[in-house]
Regions:
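Short microdomains enriched in Cys/His and/or Lys/Arg
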Residues: 245-255
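Short, surface-exposed secondary-structure boundary micro-motifs
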Residues: 45-47, 96, 234
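Local cysteine-cluster metal-coordination motifs and their immediate loop/turn environment
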Residues: 194, 216-245
């Protein structure tokens, strides 16, 4: 799959919650190639600070309009700069990068938390309206603004929060074992905090259900050259940016 280095124009941004924004950019070559699970590397300004590009999972694509969507949390210098860009501003983007999800599941369950719900949104879109169920967890109701983004895509939405402010109190593991037992799912797709992914992968192993994980690592180059994202796989070192970011759970040796 080809990779494009493109100067793209910002279509617009919108606020999702106090620390999270959604941005749409006009990137027709990337939109034509991207598949669920891939990411792009973004340089947010023309000068040298911040020097390195930042990886963002593709959260959606509109091939007809030639646009891609990214969702990000405002937590560092690069994302603070990104939060201030306006319609018509330009960004430098490399992508699409990495390998995407296996799309052969007949009854998929998506499990996510935090920004891990961004690439899963594109996956739900890829399976088509009403063909996925989603289990999402957060610390509080404020973090689960994602329900509005998924409600037109997923058939069933299951919620958990640490404080019990919405859905079931606890983590996604409060609901997952029962869903695996009764839901008839043939594959689980998970992205989010490492402890959550590890717990989900182990639960799927015990239940005999296939599981794919989308790993989140710092990626300086996004091409497998710098090794900043390398980690232990089963029997070999894996480069998250090049070999992944999506892996079958049994391929991951280091969580």
């Amino acid at each position: 799959m080809s990779k494009t280095i493109a100067s793209v124009k910002v279509i617009g941004q919108r606020v999702l919650n106090s620390t999270t924004k959604l941005i749409n950019v006009y990137a027709p070559e990337i939109a034509a190639e991207a598949v669920p699970g891939q990411f792009v590397n973004v340089k947010v300004c023309k000068n040298t600070a911040p020097l390195l590009r930042r990886p963002f999972g593709v959260a959606g694509v509109n091939k007809a309009e030639g646009s891609i969507t990214m969702i990000y949390r405002i937590i560092g210098e690069a994302t603070h700069i990104l939060a201030d860009v306006c319609s018509g501003d330009e960004l430098s983007i490399v992508g699409p990068l990495g390998h995407g999800f296996d799309m052969s599941a007949k009854k998929p369950l998506l499990v996510g938390g935090g920004l891990g719900l961004a690439p899963l949104l594109f996956l739900a879109e890829g399976f088509g309206e009403g063909n996925t169920d989603i289990l999402m967890g957060g610390r509080s109701a404020e973090e689960l603004f994602w329900t509005k983004l998924y409600e037109s895509l997923s058939k069933n939405i299951y919620l958990t929060t640490d404080d019990g402010s919405v859905g079931t109190k606890g983590t996604v593991m409060a609901l997952l074992p029962q869903l695996l037992k009764e839901g008839g799912y043939d594959c689980v797709y998970v992205c989010g905090p490492v402890p959550m992914m590890r717990a989900v992968a182990n639960a799927c192993l015990e239940a005999g259900v296939k599981c794919q994980v989308s790993l989140e690592k710092y990626m300086a180059c996004g091409l497998g050259a710098c090794l900043s994202c390398a980690c232990e796989g089963i029997g070999k070192r894996i480069k998250v940016c090049k070999d992944g970011p999506v892996f079958w759970a049994e391929e991951v040796g280091e969580w």
